[in-house]
Amino acid sequence: MASYAPFIKPYVQYNEHGWGPCEIPDMDVPYQPFCKSDRLGKICDWTVAMQEKKFSNKYASSFGNNSQYAYFHEDDDSTFHLVDTSGSRALKPYQRGRFRPNVRNNARVKGRSGRGPGMLGVAGSMAGGGTTSGSTKYGKGRESRRNQGRRFARNAPSRLRESSVLVRPNWVSLEEIEFPRLLKLALPNIKEGQDIVTCGSLEYYDKLYDRINLRNERPLLKMDRIVHTVTTTDDPVIRRLSKTMGNVFATDEILATIMCCTRSNYSWDVVIEKLGTKVFLDKRDNAQFDLLTVNETSLEPPMDEEGSINSAHSLAMEATLINHNFGQQVLRVGEQEPRFKFGEPNPFEEPGVELACLGYRYRQWQLGNDLVLVARCKHNGVIQGPNGEVQFLSIKALNEWDSKAANSVEWRQKLDTQRGAVLASELRNNACKLARWTVEAVLAGSDQLKLGYVSRVTPRDHLRHVILGTQQFKPQEFATQINLNMDNAWGILRCLVDIVMKQPDGKYLIVKDPNKPMVRLYDIPENSFDSDAEDEENSSEPFANSLDN
């Protein structure tokens, strides 16, 4: 019987607490995680080369640990040779005069038309974008500068604006509405407002200011009259009317800000108080809500430089004072001059204080779903129509500060001959402000919107101004010209009011985001904006005080 090899029983480890071997012998083989789908570019690489910038992760591992085995493109310098071009063959005298001017001219024609493969030899290198000195001088230098300007304009970092109010941590965000959603809203068939109470008196417009032109300019005077910008809850007439009629109360400035919010770039805020079925749209005390913006919608808005006369805040103060002085200067002021008086006196009169003559109209609108809006609107003056009728005016002023810095049309050159170009430039740079003025005129029922063109005497003097001309429009027609849809404006207001009506009684705040096209609704405590600390943080001079200085 054949002998068999002896059977040696192997040693088997027994795992009492699981399955598999209890320990792994040390084989001195390094382990590295890998993926079978990775493409191997090299077997090994002892030096790490610079990765390709455009496709740096083309052969990278999905695990990210065995990148030394990935493929990276390397230039082979073994076949690189330097070529000495200093000893190039000179052209013959008879060729130098005929050939080289044609090269330059053909290169220019080739660069302008962009046709053909280019000339051979030196001409081909120049026309085809070569690196000769001639191409750098005539074509490549200008093109690179143009591309550089466009590149920096396109990739320039966006300017971060500050919010009009400091958002507190204890404020609750209720709603965020983007402008594209608001632009789709519409509330048609809103009839013209009905007058409830009319107060104040109006002076007649001086028609001599319609004859002002560039050759007959007139200096802008400083008027000592005071304008009170009383908010909604402090208006005694609105307090009286809120007891018997209406459930939404506001002023024309607040309504215009909300209805034209999709055109605004700067931050603003509106305080809302809900008491039962009544909603009051209000503004914060000592806020910059009443300041007029300058070049808000321009491609290059004013910079926020402290101490500069061309900063955003300084220009806003200047524009507000110009608008106030112009609105009073163009009126026929005097005790012997006639006035148009409304049914009730000015509700904001104070003894010993000379107030500007303004006419206030408290009107109401039916917004549907038992929503009745009551708002205070105003007129700045009156004028006698062609048939002897009285027409109400809304008088506003556009101001020019520095046409070169503002990248706009220079008024002193084109205001008389190309007034349409000047107005188009203002519509581009101040679209939101003009839309607000138009909405205020439409809400008040003004027959005409009178615009004045006021400019600095010199660009560096922000205290002296001259009136260069005036222009008038019908508010409804001007709204059509600037593409202002009143149905959309009413829809935006109705949307925000409906959102607030669904909330419990309390205090709310609508804030325009300073850097995004959206508005936010916050639920804020009742004591917000009441403490002295809040007034110090949001300190700004009241509009009435600024007019006294």
From Swiss-Prot:
GO cellular component terms given for this protein: eukaryotic 43S preinitiation complex; eukaryotic 48S preinitiation complex; eukaryotic translation initiation factor 3 complex
Keywords: Cytoplasm, Initiation factor, Protein biosynthesis, RNA-binding
Annotated spans, RNA gate: 288-302
Feature: compositional bias, Gly residues: 114-132
Renumbered residue ranges of the record's region Disordered: 107-157, 527-549
Record text about domains: The RNA gate region regulates mRNA cap recognition to prevent promiscuous mRNA-binding before assembly of eif3d into the full eukaryotic translation initiation factor 3 (eIF-3) complex.
Family indicated by similarity: Belongs to the eIF-3 subunit D family.
Protein name from the UniProt record: Eukaryotic translation initiation factor 3 subunit D-2
Lineage: Eukaryota, Metazoa, Ecdysozoa, Arthropoda, Hexapoda
Gene name for this UniProt entry: eIF3d2
